């Protein structure tokens, strides 16, 4: 997320890149207002079209709209900021992030929640971290294809369960 202020409120903006001009929708209120981008008026040079049809809805991956190289820089910055609390000279000790060969379908583990609503009973997906609603996904772009396949096989057959995990070999 990136932060913004509006009428004295601090906003955590998901789906935006620092410096962009965007329209947002407030989806939750904690100490800050939690917002999702609904329209990009002036995009950042590192913005890309993400592949995920559930982007921002499931709240799982938050960088899919950013070029991969920039994602690595952002993630390195997050790690540095956390570690600076413990070591003021951390900048000199952290190497560059080693990029992965795979930009998608790399995760080999997932934990899914199972729907208890009558309409979707036994189907599974992810819980949105802000709305706490189950998002029934059709496919997760960052999950290994074996996980997507197994989740689809199990769909509709999970009555009585609340969660389950899948882990697959990547070989």
Regions found by a protein language model. Give the residues of each.
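Accessory RNA-recognition modules of RNA-modification enzymes
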Residues: 1-171
């Amino acid at each position: 997320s990136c932060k913004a202020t509006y009428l004295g409120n601090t906003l955590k903006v998901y789906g935006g890149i620092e410096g962009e001009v965007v329209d947002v929708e407030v989806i939750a209120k904690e100490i800050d207002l939690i917002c999702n981008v609904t329209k990009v008026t002036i995009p950042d040079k590192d913005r890309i079209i993400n592949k995920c049809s559930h982007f921002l809805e499931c709240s799982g991956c938050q960088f899919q709209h950013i070029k991969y190289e920039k994602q690595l820089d952002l993630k390195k910055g997050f790690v540095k900021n956390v570690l600076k609390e413990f070591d003021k000279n951390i900048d000199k000790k952290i190497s560059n992030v080693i990029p992965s060969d795979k930009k998608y379908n790399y995760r080999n583990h997932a934990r899914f929640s199972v729907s208890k609503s009558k309409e979707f009973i036994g189907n599974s997906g992810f819980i949105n971290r802000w709305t706490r609603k189950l998002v029934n996904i059709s496919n997760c772009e960052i999950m290994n294809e074996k996980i997507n396949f197994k989740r689809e096989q199990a769909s509709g057959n999970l009555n009585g369960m609340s969660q389950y995990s899948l882990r697959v070999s990547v070989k």
